[in-house]
């Protein structure tokens, strides 16, 4: 699979159903788009088995609770969704991305607790992330941005809102 991530063949598991990859869309007024109310897991599958999958599913649920939303699926249901997506895309060795987010609803305030919570799982073939550097060694950068104080955000959560400070150095230069 190559090309733009929004224009691929395959299936994505979204809110209980396998849908066409290109149909996996969310509205521009989705709460997560404005307030980063989303959590995710990035996992690898080898020979059809997702590495430490249950632990990742447990952390996904825990991360969501830390940022004040509850994913409407159990660990077992998330596990089934991940493996359904792998099989639907006929993948054995793959990257598995589970993402949950507060969606568009009646509210657009910071909390928006009444808005629905969504879950999607995408799987795709993704080779060695580090390419040749895996054997040669990788160049590392240290962001000039300091992570927020642990009292300002739930730093244990694998939440989108906590990743931007690390990436901002790349964006800003």
Listing of model-derived features with the role each one plays in the protein:
Residues 1-165:
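Conserved alpha/beta cores of soluble small-molecule-handling proteins
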Residues 163, 167-173:
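Single conserved hydrophobic/aromatic residue that forms the stacking wall/gate
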């Amino acid at each position: 699979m190559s090309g733009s991530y929004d224009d691929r063949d395959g299936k994505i598991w979204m809110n209980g159903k396998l849908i066409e990859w290109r149909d996996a869309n969310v509205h521009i007024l989705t709460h997560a788009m404005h307030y980063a109310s989303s959590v995710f897991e990035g996992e690898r599958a080898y020979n059809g088995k997702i590495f430490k999958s249950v632990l990742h599913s447990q952390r996904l649920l825990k991360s969501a609770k830390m940022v004040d939303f509850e994913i409407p699926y159990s660990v077992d249901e998330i596990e089934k969704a991940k493996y359904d997506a792998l099989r639907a895309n006929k993948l054995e060795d793959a990257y598995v991305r589970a993402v949950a987010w507060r969606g568009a609803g009646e509210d657009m305030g910071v909390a928006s607790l009444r808005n629905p919570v969504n879950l999607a799982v995408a799987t795709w073939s993704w080779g060695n992330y580090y390419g040749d550097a895996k054997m040669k060694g990788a160049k590392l950068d240290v962001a000039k941005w300091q992570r927020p104080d642990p009292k300002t955000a739930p730093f244990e959560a694998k939440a989108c809102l906590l990743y931007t400070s690390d990436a901002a150095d790349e964006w800003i230069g």
